[in-house]
């Protein structure tokens, strides 16, 4: 009698649950049942209104398997979800996507690296799917935070650490691809997200062994010489892609975190990494946005007007690189303002040098005074060289105006009327 009761109750279960249960073998090592998966896919395509229930039931099973550490069944559930996502593109896919993202989040929250990588791979597949209609309410805040945390993994095992970081970078790249072209997801460009995205990429790019290579366009990225994925190269590729998609209104939020990261990690002296970053920026953005980057570096220089000479020199040298790469005429509409900023810092540097020189005998030793003076000379030479590159990027009709502007702005110390020798500028 009990057996008869069980036989009667079995068919009472909803068909979608029976179809879902059938894809899970008794032994998870046998993997996903392909024939039963085909039946489930056909059912989902034929009855798309059932997709949300299928997703909810799969999510329920996956959560239970994660808690019980039955990771073989977790892998099967995610494989089934991936196939359903690829096969179904109707309006009813949206509730299913919500269940899918909840399951991905469940895996990312796990402390198991294998589950984190599994969840990331599924998210990347989802990110490459073009949905028929945009989502008005979907948010990716959690994924930005979680993938960014994975990018900073400090796992004890180097190989596992690399796997987690690579997965985090791929996840961020998936978020970027899913959101940057969607006007409804413009929130991704807001500071709270860029302040996580950009530093995560730069943190991994700092491990690159070839900074000079990193700055040039068309650099092959993603895999090391042994065929394994390299976090530094992958982060650079993602960084380039993000910058290439940035509109003019988003440039400030994209570049500011770079400047802050360089400040926080003291990367202006020496400035090889800073130069590499801005080469990548200038080669990746649209040419008409170049002057916006130049202006941001100038503004950042203003905030460091009282810092150590070598830090200021490092910023000026980065500015020089951006100007050298910028297209002709891309300095922007406020040309004289740009030159005025540079000349202001040149004058301040000279003032610092003269002040130190006058106090040298009473406050510091001769050797340290000369060292301070030589450091200020480094700043001055960098500024003068940058002014020259700016002049080289100007149209011919503006150069005479700029030369007159410079001559009127920079007097030579010790003479009442003479002006700076401008033969080396422009």
Question: Language-model segments: which ranges?
Answer:
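HEAT/armadillo-like alpha-solenoid scaffolds in large eukaryotic assembly and transport factors
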Residues: 2-9, 40-51, 66-70, 88-97, ...
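Charge-rich, solvent-exposed alpha-helical interaction surfaces
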Residues: 15, 19, 57, 146, ...
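Long, well-ordered core segments of solenoidal/helical folds
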Residues: 104, 200-209, 342-350, 409-411
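Phosphoinositide-driven peripheral membrane association surfaces
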Residues: 59, 102-111, 116, 302, ...
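N-terminal alpha-helical scaffolding segments that mark the starts
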Residues: 1-55
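HEAT-repeat alpha-solenoid elements in large eukaryotic scaffold proteins
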Residues: 25-41, 54-61, 70-85, 114-129, ...
């Amino acid at each position: 009698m009990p057996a008869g009761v069980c036989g009667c109750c079995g068919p009472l279960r909803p068909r979608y649950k029976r179809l879902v249960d059938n894809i899970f073998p008794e032994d998870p090592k046998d993997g996903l049942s392909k024939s039963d998966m085909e039946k489930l896919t056909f059912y989902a395509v034929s009855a798309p209104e059932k997709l949300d229930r299928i997703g909810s039931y799969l999510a329920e099973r996956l959560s239970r398997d994660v808690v019980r550490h039955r990771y073989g069944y977790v892998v099967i559930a995610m494989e089934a979800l991936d196939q359903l996502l690829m096969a179904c593109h109707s309006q009813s896919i949206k509730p299913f996507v919500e269940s899918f993202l909840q399951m991905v989040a469940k895996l990312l929250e796990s402390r198991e690296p294998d589950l984190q990588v599994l969840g990331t791979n599924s998210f990347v597949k989802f990110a490459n799917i073009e949905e028929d209609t945009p989502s008005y309410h979907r948010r990716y805040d959690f994924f930005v935070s979680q993938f960014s945390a994975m990018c900073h993994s400090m796992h004890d095992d180097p190989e596992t650490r690399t796997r987690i970081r690579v997965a985090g970078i791929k996840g961020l790249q998936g978020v970027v691809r899913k959101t940057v072209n969607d006007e409804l997801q413009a929130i991704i460009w807001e500071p709270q997200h860029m302040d996580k995205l950009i530093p995560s990429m730069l943190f991994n790019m700092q491990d690159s062994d070839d900074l000079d290579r990193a700055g040039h366009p068309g650099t092959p990225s993603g895999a090391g010489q042994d065929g394994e994925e390299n976090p530094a190269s992958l982060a650079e590729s993602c960084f380039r892609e993000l910058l290439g998609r940035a509109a003019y209104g988003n440039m400030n939020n994209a570049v500011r975190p770079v400047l802050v990261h360089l400040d926080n990690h003291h990367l202006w002296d020496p400035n090889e990494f800073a130069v590499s970053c801005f080469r990548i920026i200038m080669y990746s953005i649209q040419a008409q946005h170049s002057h916006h980057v130049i202006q941001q570096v100038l503004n950042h220089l203003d905030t460091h007007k009282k810092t150590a000479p070598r830090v200021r020199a490092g910023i000026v040298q980065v500015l020089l690189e951006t100007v050298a790469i910028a297209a002709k005429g891309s300095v922007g509409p406020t040309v004289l303002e740009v030159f005025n900023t540079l000349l202001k810092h040149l004058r301040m540097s000279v003032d610092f040098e003269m002040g130190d020189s006058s106090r040298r005998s009473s406050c510091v030793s001769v050797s340290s005074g000369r060292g301070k003076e030589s450091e200020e000379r480094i700043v001055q030479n960098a500024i003068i060289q940058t002014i020259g590159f700016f002049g080289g990027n100007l149209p011919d009709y503006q150069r005479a105006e700029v030369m007159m502007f410079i001559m009127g702005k920079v007097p030579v110390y010790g003479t009442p009327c003479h002006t700076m020798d401008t033969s080396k500028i422009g």
